Amino acid sequence: MSSNEEVFTQINATANVVDNKKRLLFVQDSSALVLGLVAGFLQIESVHGFIWFLILYNLINVIYIVWICQLQPGKFYQSPLHDIFFESFFREITGFVMAWTFGYALIG
């Protein structure tokens, strides 16, 4: 095995992938809650709130890929597209809606 393959195997080891997913989940959880609070404070309603979430959620994921993964998410995740964009989507939209209604109730 060449040294490049050994390095890739170490980076893509199960423990490292789990740690990377935890860090990504923290970023996504924090972002979803902040986006929900801001949407509530701005009194965004209905479909506009969900569009707000979808656009900014994807933008934050792209920033994560560019800044943290340095445009090489395959080095850090076994299935980058699924792991970054889809795996925790319903978890994040639930947190967003919770924070959105809380922020909306505080202002309204």
From Swiss-Prot:
Cell inner membrane among keywords: no
Sequence intervals crossing the membrane: 24-44, 49-69, 88-106
GO biological process: autophagosome assembly; phospholipid metabolic process; phospholipid transport; protein folding in endoplasmic reticulum; protein insertion into ER membrane by stop-transfer membrane-anchor sequence
Broad class of the protein's primary localization: endoplasmic reticulum
Membrane topology: Multi-pass membrane protein
Keyword Membrane: yes
Keywords from the UniProt entry: Endoplasmic reticulum, Membrane, Transmembrane, Transmembrane helix
Subcellular compartments: Endoplasmic reticulum membrane
Signal peptide start-end: none
Pfam families with a match to the protein in the record: EMC6
Cellular component terms (Gene Ontology): EMC complex; endoplasmic reticulum
Cytoplasmic side of membrane: 1-23, 70-87
Side Lumenal, residues: 45-48, 107-108
Function: Part of the endoplasmic reticulum membrane protein complex (EMC) that enables the energy-independent insertion into endoplasmic reticulum membranes of newly synthesized membrane proteins. Preferentially accommodates proteins with transmembrane domains that are weakly hydrophobic or contain destabilizing features such as charged and aromatic residues. Involved in the cotranslational insertion of multi-pass membrane proteins in which stop-transfer membrane-anchor sequences become ER membrane spanning helices.
Protein family: Belongs to the EMC6 family.
PANTHER family named among the record's database cross-references: ER MEMBRANE PROTEIN COMPLEX SUBUNIT 6
Assembly, per entry: Component of the ER membrane protein complex (EMC), which is composed of EMC1, EMC2, EMC3, EMC4, EMC5 and EMC6.
Listed name of the protein: ER membrane protein complex subunit 6
Origin species: Saccharomyces cerevisiae (strain ATCC 204508 / S288c) (Baker's yeast)
